[in-house]
Design a protein with these regions (language model features):
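Compact, glycine-rich, soluble single-domain proteins
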Residues: 8-87
Length: 87
């Protein structure tokens, strides 16, 4: 079943908000492996490891490198708090 629901992804560092976009799927580099988040996912708070944050929208994939931090998923919003983002 196709869905038009999207996730909102917000990435924040101590200096500024780096990203505020929508995506079909967000892949997070958690401390114990990757976590794929799709619309409708149950709420969670987790610790991020160093790795690649990916936003999938249709056939487009955008990537950023994170240096750890924390992620919250709630009501189709993925919030990432990290010290450093590159990409």
């Amino acid at each position: 079943m196709a869905t038009d629901k999207k996730l909102k992804c917000v990435v924040v560092t101590p200096e500024r908000a780096v990203l505020d976009e929508t995506a079909d799927m967000v892949i997070l580099p958690m401390i114990d492996g990757e976590l794929g988040v799709q619309p409708g996912r149950a709420a969670l708070v987790g610790r991020l490891g160093k790795g690649e944050l990916r936003l999938n929208s249709g056939s487009q994939v955008r990537k950023w490198r994170l240096e750890g931090g924390f992620a919250q998923v709630r009501s189709d919003v993925v919030t990432v708090l990290t010290t450093k983002v590159t990409g």
